[in-house]
Amino acid sequence: MTKTTRLTPGDKAPAFTLPDADGNNVSLADYRGRRVIVYFYPAASTPGCTKQACDFRDNLGDFTTAGLNVVGISPDKPEKLATFRDAQGLTFPLLSDPDREVLTAWGAYGEKQMYGKTVQGVIRSTFVVDEDGKIVVAQYNVKATGHVAKLRRDLSV
């Protein structure tokens, strides 16, 4: 099993270019000069991931007003992300990382505890990246329920 190196506030956010739900490439560099919430989740259309995505959807207006963009990343293929996006009415980008390279670079893939066992998988994580590409918030092992509300409080949104 692989232990991950976790990112911390002040670190430069690892660059990425990944396909979105429509197969178009999206890069972290596309958000240069803007703040962006990057969140990693295990699988589209599962109960916890759906709850988390819908919480981001329902709070997107407030995040946008506060100058924050939202991007979700999972190992799902673009086709599955498109189905998930359309079913849930998600309007922010969902990106596909099937090789888990970006997940690993951000410390969001590796050993985790699940039902009392150590397993290898996606570590539900959320980051806020500032206008200069630096991480200002790094949260690992977040809970799907209540996480977005906590993030709003932490960011005073």
From Swiss-Prot:
Gene3D superfamilies: Glutaredoxin. Residues 7-157 form the Thioredoxin domain. The gene is bcp. GO terms for biological process: cell redox homeostasis; cellular response to oxidative stress. Its EC number is 1.11.1.24. Belongs to the peroxiredoxin family. BCP/PrxQ subfamily. Monomer. GO terms for cellular component: cytoplasm; cytosol; plasma membrane. It catalyses: a hydroperoxide + [thioredoxin]-dithiol = an alcohol + [thioredoxin]-disulfide + H2O. NCBIfam families: PRK09437.1. The active site is a conserved redox-active cysteine residue, the peroxidatic cysteine (C(P)), which makes the nucleophilic attack on the peroxide substrate. The peroxide oxidizes the C(P)-SH to cysteine sulfenic acid (C(P)-SOH), which then reacts with another cysteine residue, the resolving cysteine (C(R)), to form a disulfide bridge. The disulfide is subsequently reduced by an appropriate electron donor to complete the catalytic cycle. In this atypical 2-Cys peroxiredoxin, C(R) is present in the same subunit to form an intramolecular disulfide. Disulfide bonds join C49-C54. Thiol-specific peroxidase that catalyzes the reduction of hydrogen peroxide and organic hydroperoxides to water and alcohols, respectively. Plays a role in cell protection against oxidative stress by detoxifying peroxides and as sensor of hydrogen peroxide-mediated signaling events. One of its GO terms (molecular function) is thioredoxin peroxidase activity. Keywords: Antioxidant, Disulfide bond, Isopeptide bond, Oxidoreductase, Peroxidase, Redox-active center, Ubl conjugation. SUPFAM superfamilies: Thioredoxin-like. This is Putative peroxiredoxin Rv2521. The active site is at C49.
